[in-house]
Every structure is written in structure tokens, then in C-alpha cells.
A protein has these predicted regions:
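C-terminal binding/interaction regions
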Residues: 1-54, 59-76, 82-158
């Protein structure tokens, strides 16, 4: 398998997707923010001074998905049909669990948009809680599934 983002001289290029037929594309990505017990309880009780951490992070994730081509150089600007983020508190692992779903009818996939959404949501959790905990860990940023396109479907086995 060859890398598609390099030209014959080995220089970076944006892949031409103009000849591809549009198809339904979906991607689901995840991320996790590991917290200490005190920070977890603050989020749970709504006691973080900057506001509702999970709601703000959800909105930030949507905004991040929409700005993906501004952040990832070879990522095509696409017309996203839907972005859905869910953030939940996992008491057992003392973490915020983030799932981002992105969909479109297009010529290229939405994996980067889903990954960016999950990442930006995680960064927002960190930003909103850094006054009370600086050693939070953002982890497990990963593609969980994708469908559509010439490379077919993918589902992570966890």
C-alpha cells in the first residue's frame, strides 16, 4: 500500500478526489480524559468554575470537527451532514469518556473530522479543569469505526 499524500518527487500534496463518486461516509472516534477523584467529583456536581464541562466540551467537539481542514493540512473541506458527540463520566476509571460520530455524503471519509472532534472535546475538558488539576491525562484517541469508501468498513476490536 502506498501513501497517497505524496507526489512523484516525494512532496506533500492534497489527493484529487474529484473523480470519485460520492457515497455515504461515517466515522466514530473516541477519547478519554483521566482525572483524579476530586476533579471527577467537581465535574459530576457541576462545581467547575468555568461552567458545565461536558456541555462546553460537546460544543467544542462539534466546532473542532467543522474546523478540521484548517488544522490538518491535507484534509479536504467537506460538507458534513451530521456531528454527534456524547460525553459521559466513568466512575470506575475516574474519567470522561468521549465518543464522536460524523457523517456525510461525499468523496472522502470523515475519519479526521471524528478524531478531531474527540480530541478537541478532550482538550476542552482539560482546559476547563486545569485550575484544579494539571496532571490530567488525555488518552486513547482512536478511530472506533468507519464506513464507506474504496477501503471499505473498519471496526476496532477492543
Amino acid at each position: 500500500m502506498d501513501f497517497t499524500h505524496f507526489n512523484d518527487q516525494g512532496r506533500a500534496k492534497m489527493v484529487d478526489v474529484g473523480e470519485k463518486d460520492p457515497s455515504r461516509r461515517t466515522a466514530v472516534a473516541g477519547a478519554r480524559v483521566l482525572l483524579n477523584r476530586d476533579t471527577f467529583r467537581l465535574i459530576q456536581s457541576g462545581g467547575v468554575k468555568k461552567g458545565d464541562v461536558l456541555t462546553v466540551a460537546q460544543i467544542a467537539g462539534v466546532m473542532g470537527a467543522k474546523r478540521t481542514p484548517d488544522l490538518i493540512p491535507m484534509c479536504h473541506p467537506i460538507l458534513i451532514d451530521g456531528i454527534d458527540l456524547s460525553l459521559s463520566l466513568d466512575e470506575e476509571h475516574c474519567s470522561v469518556e468521549i465518543i464522536a460520530r460524523v457523517s456525510c455524503d461525499g468523496r472522502t471519509g470523515v475519519e479526521m473530522e471524528a478524531l478531531t472532534a474527540a480530541s478537541v472535546a478532550a482538550l476542552t475538558v482539560y482546559d476547563m479543569c486545569k485550575a484544579v488539576q494539571r496532571d490530567m491525562v488525555i488518552s486513547d484517541i482512536r478511530l472506533l469505526s468507519k464506513s464507506g469508501g474504496v477501503h471499505g468498513d473498519f471496526v476496532r476490536q477492543e
